[in-house]
Amino acid sequence: MATAANQIGRITQVIGAVVDVQFEGHLPAILNSLETKNAGNRLVLEVAQHLGESTVRTIAMDTTEGLVRGQEVTDTGAPIRVPVGEGTLGRIINVIGEPIDEAGPVKADSLRAIHQEAPSYTDQSTEAEILVTGIKVVDLLAPYAKGGKIGLFGGAGVGKTVLIQELINNVAKAHGGYSVFAGVGERTREGNDLYHEFIESKVNADPHNPDPSVKSKCALVFGQMNEPPGARARVALTGLTIAEDFRDKGQDVLFFVDNIFRFTQAGSEVSALLGRIPSAVGYQPTLATDMGALQERITTTTKGSITSVQAIYVPADDLTDPAPATSFAHLDATTTLSRSIAEKGIYPAVDPLDSTSRMLSPLVVGEEHYAVARQVQQVLQRYKALQDIIAILGMDELSEEDKLTVARARKVERFMSQPFHVAEIFTGSPGKFVELADTIKGFKGLVEGKYDHLPEAAFYMVGTIEEAVEKGKKLAAEAA
């Protein structure tokens, strides 16, 4: 066992984010956290390799400028530990659990190591259950599994962040669950904007001047683009550790990762720094193992669930690139946001034909839901096929049957839009949470032609089908 004296080592070499530390007689275990001071600040190093009998190679969690050879380093005897519990809600912490929102220390229930084993088979729940999000297009066509993993694809400016905010808001309201947002290697400006948007849209309370009527629903963990690769490779684990603690206390937790590609990218940088031989396209040889170690911890246990929504950047739009291809293997559902739908003013801009889910099976969602979803996709697919003809020859050249299909498809498309709670402050229209039964009923009536008499505009930005009928009456009265 290590005594206090031999828990102290000395730095022998610093190469960028890699620091070698020599210990006499006792070597810290792999993944142990070592601490030193750099310009008065705490610097955490994580043991990655043992070199020879007395030296460990570590990855720094912050910048290493200013470190000198011979400097003392202390072995903490445990992996990196971060604060967990309700004290983290509404706060921003970094990879090592320090608050970075200038609102004082985090009031944590306890500390928990960021490296944990995935739950054993006996602890996992095997029931296939749907997480109702209250967002019509998602619940109908690509339903999320409780404890599942969802990939969120979308370019810049199509509404990824607003969709994420609405999911956080709805899960908190409908399921009483908390959320954890891990910003992995993305822009610091976006992280800052997100933090302030969460406060404005009442997802979180402002820690600087708290409003007693607002309860924070989301913890934020950031390791942004400017951080060294060590921090970016570990920040997703820090966020996951906070989520696991909520889950073990019986919560249904939402865990957001933006962006899962940056986790792989940081892993590849660390791997190169450690001198490992790269594999395909320059990625780390342990790519699948690293991804598996993270993803296998995201699951439903007998106590609670972690449902994860992961934004996935696809480098050069190449879906066969090893990084996105490895993450696809773990996904239960994909939600694809489309620019062409956003251009029509239909929000959320979810592509109904490109979004998929493993849960959309009659055995899980039931015969009626499955049949309605497939009919909706059929109508939209037919409309898509007819668009070229409409563009060249116009609507008049279509058969009566096709005209009816187009009219219904356009109504279905508009009915997929809905006002969001988190966008109320911008749009002025109150947000809507639509129950699954109402969603199925509405779309079923639409594809069966029950609402053929209503104008298209009646279906735009409403919640349930009853609201669309009301809006239709109002529009008719105004026109009369």
UniProtKB/Swiss-Prot annotation:
Presence of keyword Transport: yes
High-level lineage: Bacteria, Pseudomonadati, Pseudomonadota, Alphaproteobacteria, Hyphomicrobiales
Domain of life (superkingdom): Bacteria
Cell compartment(s), UniProt: Cell inner membrane
Binding residue positions for ATP: G154, G155, A156, G157, V158, G159, K160, T161
Complex and partners: F-type ATPases have 2 components, CF(1) - the catalytic core - and CF(0) - the membrane proton channel. CF(1) has five subunits: alpha(3), beta(3), gamma(1), delta(1), epsilon(1). CF(0) has four main subunits: a(1), b(1), b'(1) and c(9-12).
Record-linked InterPro entries: AAA+_ATPase, ATP-synt_VA_C, ATP_synth_F1_bsu, ATPase_a/bsu_AS, ATPase_alpha/beta_chains, ATPase_F1/V1/A1_a/bsu_N, ATPase_F1/V1/A1_a/bsu_N_sf, ATPase_F1/V1/A1_a/bsu_nucl-bd
Family: Belongs to the ATPase alpha/beta chains family.
EC number: 7.1.2.2
Topological category with respect to the lipid bilayer: Peripheral membrane protein
Gene3D superfamilies in UniProt: 2.40.10.170, Bovine Mitochondrial F1-atpase, Atp Synthase Beta Chain, Chain D, domain 3, P-loop containing nucleotide triphosphate hydrolases
Annotated PANTHER family: ATP SYNTHASE, ATP SYNTHASE SUBUNIT BETA, MITOCHONDRIAL
A GO molecular-function descriptor: ATP binding
Name of the protein described by the UniProt record: ATP synthase subunit beta 1
Originating organism: Bradyrhizobium sp. (strain BTAi1 / ATCC BAA-1182)
Assigned keywords, A-Z: ATP synthesis, ATP-binding, Cell inner membrane, Cell membrane, CF(1), Hydrogen ion transport, Ion transport, Membrane, Nucleotide-binding, Translocase, Transport
Chain's gene name: atpD1
NCBIfam families the record matches: atpD
